[in-house]
Amino acid sequence: MTQHRITDDLDALLDVLPINIRHAVEKANNSEKLLEIILDLGRVPTARFVEEEIVLQEKEITRAEIDYVDERTGEFDADNRAGIERTLHRISAIRNRRGAVVGLTLRVGRAVYGTVDIIQDIIESGKSVLILGRPGVGKTTLLREAARILAENKRVVIVDTSNEIGGDGDVPHPAVGRARRMQVREPMLQHEVMIEAVENHNPEVTVIDEIGRELEAAAARTSPSAVCSLSARHTDKPSIIFCSTQR
């Protein structure tokens, strides 16, 4: 079995934090299990780890600290998500009704090589596969590694709606290997990019981070039978489903 290798570019995420909060994260000395950093205006900052959530400091987050992170973050998309170029980290904003950012979730993105060993026979079967699971259990990590492995011998195109598979910026993260990546201007246009990927770029495999709308399911059905699709969907019941179409 392939040994797992993890890269996370964590310093790039810590660099956007105010220095006092960065030092608090580093003082926790548990970076390998760090999942998210939570900054909400008027509340104490916290860090979420695999097994616990801790308070980083007793001082409440100020407007200046929210603005500090906001100014060092890439532009937020229509879904209030942003990233850091050439990394897999995701920064999500909470806004008030006037549009000002009042909360931030900084999620650590990790490339984990070797994660698909247990299902490699499934992803190489030539069938379309839908991966089901709760948010945060590693569905995107599996898709990213599957795209890298399949791209060694097949034409793979990733439809990367939130830039979580290939990372932020115009150049995809090395973790996707030779797979090509198409970005999506707005989440509601994902189904159009799915169709465009098949019609314009002749893939043997398409990889979609999440299929959650009826139009996206319909777009998956229009793909020729020779094109297999790997995708994920949020659910409370983890599973892997073979499917001739996404239902």
Where do the model's predicted regions map?
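Well-ordered alpha-helical segments embedded in enzymatic catalytic cores
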Residues: 90, 118, 142, 190-196, ...
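Short, ordered loop/turn segments at secondary-structure junctions
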Residues: 42, 134-136, 161-164, 186-189, ...
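Residue-level signature of catalytic and energy-coupling elements of molecular machines
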Residues: 37, 91, 160
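P-loop NTPase switch/communication element
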Residues: 150-197
